[in-house]
Amino acid sequence: MTILKQFAILSILATTVSAAKAQNPIINHQFSADPTARVFNGRIYLFPSHDIISPVEPEKKWFSMADYHVFSSDNLTDWTDHGVILSQEQVPWGNPKAYSMWAPDCVEKDGKYYFFFPDAPKPLAT
């Protein structure tokens, strides 16, 4: 097979792959990133970041995260959005205007669930 023919075949394959769409996106109504998946009591839970258009800098269309949602499923096809479980205004030590809540996680220990996450702290008083 000639190099030109190989290149043509690879080009067609690359075009086909790039045009493929997800057939069952888990989250299709909001921008999300950095998910953690955990199984609790036979049900899978997703804890993603929730990316919004910044109310402070609207031209910045990424990395503006003010809250967390949690999603769950028992069959990996049908997902429930349990809504906002925590917002930056509820974090006493967090900067309510930082929009930097990302990469959360949740664990269970002795029947209690612990949700943890990074957030920008309030500015120190000088």
State what each model feature region is.
Residues 1-23:
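Bacterial Sec-dependent N-terminal signal peptides
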Residues 20-126:
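Carbohydrate-active catalytic/glycan-binding domains of CAZyme proteins
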